[in-house]
Amino acid sequence: MSEAPGEAWPWWKESVFYHIYPRSFCLADPDGRRQRLGLPQDQGVAGASDHGVAGASDRVRDGAGDLEGIRRHLDHLVWLGVDALWLSPFYSSPMKDFGYDVADYCAVDPLFGSGADFDRLLAESHDRGLRVIVDFVPNHTSDQHPWFLDARSSRLAEHRDFYVWRDPDPEDAARPPNNWRRSFGEGPAWTFEETTAQWYLHLFLPEQPDLDWSNPAVVDAMEAVLGHWLERGVDGFRIDVVHALGKDPALPDAPAEVAAIPWSALNDDERTHPILRRLRSFVDAWPQEPVTVGEVFLIKTALVAKYYGDDDELHLAFNFPPMFCPFEAGCFKRRVAEIEQLLAPKAAWPTWVLSNHDRPRHRTRYGGSERRARAAAVMLLGMRGTPFLYAGEELGLEDALVPDELVVDPGGRDGCRAPIPWDSSSDHGWALGGADPWLPFPPEAAHRNVATLAADPSSILQLYRQLLALRREAAAVRKGAAELLESPDDVLAVRRTAHADECFVLVNFSAAPITWGPPAAEALLVLISSAGEGALSTPGSPYEGALGPEEAVIVRRA
């Protein structure tokens, strides 16, 4: 589905989002951090609060990025050409899950900055035409949130029913209430609370107790959180693990054949949908046209599609199946076909994402090949839908190699969270003063950094910039309809159309050149090629029907 003449077109359909993991983007103001934590200027933040993982060194705290580091690089993001930023959590947190365990939804953690720092970042982003969405973590809080501290103190506590509690089995008190498994490490999704002699549910770490969204007071309280950030001017929310909010109150066992899979990857309960309709109605009433983007980690497009509702639930839902494709045409053809068959009929606008803070970077998944990463960039930014870029993919970064003694995440996600290198200096543009960053810099940082690649007209960074400029210029690519074409086994071919504009996205997944062009196409002009210098298809020239090894192009009917 594409835009009809005269139809209002929401800003988030035309935008490219840039995902920033604040810990890993840039450290700019270490002195401000020490001041916020009340420490001498020559002392690190160790011991001020638990801003890392038990046993991790002070680098996890001292070497983390901050909000000021994001603000100072806003001009670079404008130069790159993205339209909106998504910020992973920066809220007050013990950091057991690096901010996804929230102790205060409305406060900025001093590790990252102050409330004034956030407001300045938001205002200066808006001044540059960049919208900003923030993470909303509604399934669970930190066990240090005042609600849970109160809830665990007594069965009669005011906030007791904000969480999910169950009595122990009278015949086997050591057996959890059901067989659900938690994410991040081995073990049940239940912890026994000795003080009140009941189990509480946590689909993730024991330090992340699940909220009970069947309680209207929880819905009201979390709606107030959304209102707080909307009042401050944010442009929407990425909603964490949104499919897990509604739960069967009977809490039945997982079927035996999937019992070993964490329940957070299985929960798909109809009770979530009324919650989303309530939140959507609330968000839609705000004048900045906020967007809701849901993390629906169910790995089937048919399941993801349900969370759009009848255009009354999520505005956008992350569709992760393409992220699990190897670098092969057949898998991506199937994913494109599913998206068009399942989302287009219900006018649900797709998303496209290949990397994020929870999965290995796609260049790493594709065998470390920059050629493949460049082709993937053309595909990602050429498909119908809203693309999400993960900071650093425009540099062609691979996952960092993190030795055992430096590992901080028990979930194995450290590699994709390596700090962004801004230049070729020893600290790569971070204000580290010779200290270590919270994680090692990624491979090749000495030459694969922003300053070096920005000066190279043939770099992958310049390719991303050219692709983003192309999206702004070509209506067919930005918001046109999509049609999957018949093509050779190793070629993905998608026709994009918007009124009189017609483009084709062609991706050769083979390591050999292929001669092929869209059937019955008239003269075609090459708009962009992933191959750079020496490409068989030179931008600005006629398309001769030849694709180089693992080359992707976007061509337009002349």
Language-model regions, residue ranges each:
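Flexible loop/turn segments at secondary-structure boundaries
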Residues: 27, 93-94, 140-142, 187, ...
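Surface-exposed beta-strand/loop patches in extracellular or lumenal glycoproteins
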Residues: 509-521
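Solvent-exposed beta-hairpin/edge-strand motifs
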Residues: 519-532
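C-terminal beta-strand-rich structural cap/linker in extracellular carbohydrate-active enzymes
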Residues: 538-558
